[in-house]
Amino acid sequence: MGDETVDGIEAKYISGLSTIMVATIQEAKDRISQIEYIFCSQLFPNFQSKSKAFEKVYSEARLAACDTWKDREKSLLDQIEELKVENQQIKSDKEKLAEELGKTASMPLRLTSLQGYIDHLKKKMKSRSKMVGDARDLYYRLVELLQVKGLDELSEDGINMIVSEVKSLKMKTEFLQEELSKKTLVTENLLKKLEYLSTEAADGERKLSSVEEEKQRLKTRLQVFEENVGRLEEILRQKTDEVEEGKTALEVLQGKLKLTEREMLNCKQKIADHEKEKTVVMGKAKDDMQGRHGSYLADLEALRCQSEEKSFELAMEIKKNKELSRTCKKWKSQHTFLCKRFNFTPDSVLHQSSLEDENKEIGQHEKSAISSYLERKHSETAEGADKVRIGTGSSGNNYEKESIIKTVQTPITSISPIVRSPGAAKPPQLSGLKRPASIWRDTRSRQSPGGHDPHDDFLDTPIENVKRVAGEEKHVHDVAKKDDSDDETQDMNPKPSPSRQRIQIAETSKKSFKHVESVRKKAERENLKGIECKQCKKFYDAVHPENEGNGNKSLRCEHHEGVSRHRYRYAPPMTPEGFWNIGFESEM
């Protein structure tokens, strides 16, 4: 016996160590996988993308800088060529101005020589005019002398000599007059030329001053261009130095990238080694765990079967409770109907109060029985779950935990609606969530001619089924509760809007009638749930009864959900039984 206890303690100790080892292996595996995931999915792609982006940006910046500096160099060379051309033009203009300046410097000498020549001509003209005057005086004197002495006193020789002298004097005077006219023309021309030369000299002086100003302006511009060229050359040298530094930085980054690639390869190798070790350890751990996993699964299967049996028994109890509440409501409705139809007596009141007391006693008895059964069931499921948890220990198997939670939660969720008393149980409401898009939206006019129409079965209504359903309807009286009166409506939407909640809170102080709001838009009506009225229920019970099988029931519900015309935003008030029966009997 002692050996068995020692073996059990050793087995428990070994199992605990094995679970701790499996947990540590699992934790190491998770950490390694997390490190691998972080490195492979975040660090290395981020670094690689950053390096590629930096290399791309650097190459683009380098190309852009090279292009810009080439453009600047080209523009500077063009400017230098333009400056050279302008310098050549300035030199040629300077030479021309020097020639013109030399000409203007020789102009005063020419003017003085011309002035002397003009004075000489004036003197000569004065002497010739004096000679002409003397000849005229002589001519006039001779004429006077001839008139005084007479022609007969003179000899022929003297007369001829005087005539010849007069002729020669006339010729001289004519010649002198011609020369005088020529000299006057020459003097006038010289004066005009002198005026023209003086104006040219003034223009030359003005041009010389303007050329000097242009020369000074061009000199200053040339100095500014030389300064700009020097500054641009300095900037070009700085940019070339920066390009060289960028090249060195790129080489350093490439070296770092190679080092990181090597480190990544080493990390991958380490990860592969860890994976191999992990697979070996996990294989051993799986071999150890598979032996115990079978027993755990068997215990869980037994516990699940037990919980299913208990849930089935509980469902049967719930069904019996519902049937009992239905019968009580049926008797109560029949009693109230008979009291209203016949005379109201105190005996009937006493009978009604006794029936109500009996119903309350039955409901309390069933409630206490169900609550005790629920406590017993919950304790059994909790003990079974504790046993399973103690057996599994800290193995870390998520699948076993999920199965235990499911087996424990199934009876609790199944018995949750039974907390209410049987007398307060309500019949299942017809309101619900938004109906899904049904395939019955396709009507006959839109179906293909070759396909089968599922609506055809609804037209084949046997008269026997109709009569049978009508006979069953006569014996069933489902009367609404006292709280669900005609002046109150039920909200079809499970989650009302805040505005409707505010309206309901405001209307609690004073009773008001909630009208049956009709929804006329097609899109809004499609979002509402179909409601089955009593006349439609007779038709569906005759065509597809509920007790013929699940297939007919689902077909009936699907057809009703798709084509029902009874759609409301709020549930309409219930009418009393036989309200619409006006007294005409029929086969139905």
From Swiss-Prot:
Residues 64-104, 164-281 form a coiled coil. Basal levels in mitotically dividing cells (meristems), and high levels in endoreduplicating cells (stipules, trichomes) (at protein level). One of its GO terms (cellular component) is nucleus. It comes from Arabidopsis thaliana. Induction: Strongly induced by ionizing radiation in a dose-dependent way. Regulated by ATM in response to DNA double strand breaks (DSBs) (at protein level). Keywords: Coiled coil, DNA damage, Nucleus. Seems to mediate cell cycle arrest before mitosis in response to DNA damage. Is probably also involved in the transition from mitosis to endoreduplication. GO terms for biological process: DNA damage response; DNA repair; gamete generation; response to ionizing radiation. It is found in: Nucleus. Residues 377-398, 417-525 are annotated as: Disordered. The keyword Nucleus applies. Pfam families: SAE2 (PF08573). Its main location: nucleus. This is Protein gamma response 1. Residues 377-389, 465-484, 508-525 have a biased composition (Basic and acidic residues). The lineage of its organism: Eukaryota, Viridiplantae, Streptophyta, Embryophyta, Tracheophyta. The keyword Nucleus applies.
